[in-house]
């Protein structure tokens, strides 16, 4: 009998491969994205010191979202993370899609962050 491939296990393997090459620095931090079934999260991480500089998620009260699992929520989170990053002085980042396919919510978050001023 055939077993169904575990999508999350494959995503984690992809993410490990990506993380070998994608390293954030103080000058150019890593924009990490995590997508759950109900929400989306983004962090700017300095891998040299292991510190999260800023974060944003669809759970943030300032966004006031009813549903955090759609493209509109991802767009709002992308705009918010870009605004917070610019307040901290980070304009250039390295995008870490977390092993997810660049499509849908991940793409919406990335494009919103670019439109709000982040360069990657």
From Swiss-Prot:
<keyword id="KW-0687">Ribonucleoprotein</keyword>
<dbReference type="GO" id="GO:0008097">
    <property type="term" value="F:5S rRNA binding"/>
</dbReference>
<protein>
    <recommendedName>
        <fullName>Large ribosomal subunit protein uL18</fullName>
    </recommendedName>
</protein>
<keyword id="KW-0699">rRNA-binding</keyword>
<comment type="similarity">
    <text>Belongs to the universal ribosomal protein uL18 family.</text>
</comment>
<dbReference type="InterPro" id="IPR005484">
    <property type="entry name" value="Ribosomal_uL18_bac/euk"/>
</dbReference>
<dbReference type="InterPro" id="IPR004389">
    <property type="entry name" value="Ribosomal_uL18_bac-type"/>
</dbReference>
<comment type="function">
    <text>This is one of the proteins that bind and probably mediate the attachment of the 5S RNA into the large ribosomal subunit, where it forms part of the central protuberance.</text>
</comment>
<comment type="subunit">
    <text>Part of the 50S ribosomal subunit; part of the 5S rRNA/L5/L18/L25 subcomplex. Contacts the 5S and 23S rRNAs.</text>
</comment>
<dbReference type="GO" id="GO:0022625">
    <property type="term" value="C:cytosolic large ribosomal subunit"/>
</dbReference>
<dbReference type="GO" id="GO:0006412">
    <property type="term" value="P:translation"/>
</dbReference>
<dbReference type="GO" id="GO:0003735">
    <property type="term" value="F:structural constituent of ribosome"/>
</dbReference>
<keyword id="KW-0689">Ribosomal protein</keyword>
<dbReference type="Pfam" id="PF00861">
    <property type="entry name" value="Ribosomal_L18p"/>
</dbReference>
<keyword id="KW-0694">RNA-binding</keyword>
């Amino acid at each position: 009998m055939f077993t169904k491939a575990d999508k999350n296990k494959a995503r984690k393997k992809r993410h490990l491969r990506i993380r070998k090459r994608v390293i954030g620095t103080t000058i150019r931090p890593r924009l990490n994205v995590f997508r759950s079934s109900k929400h989306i999260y983004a962090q700017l991480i300095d891998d040299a010191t292991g510190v999260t500089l800023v974060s944003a998620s669809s759970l943030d009260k300032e966004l006031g979202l009813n549903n955090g699992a759609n493209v509109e929520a991802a767009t709002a989170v992308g705009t918010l993370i870009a605004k917070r990053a610019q307040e901290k002085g980070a304009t250039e980042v390295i995008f870490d899609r977390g092993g997810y396919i660049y499509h849908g919510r991940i793409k919406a978050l990335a494009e919103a962050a670019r439109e709000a001023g982040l360069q990657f």
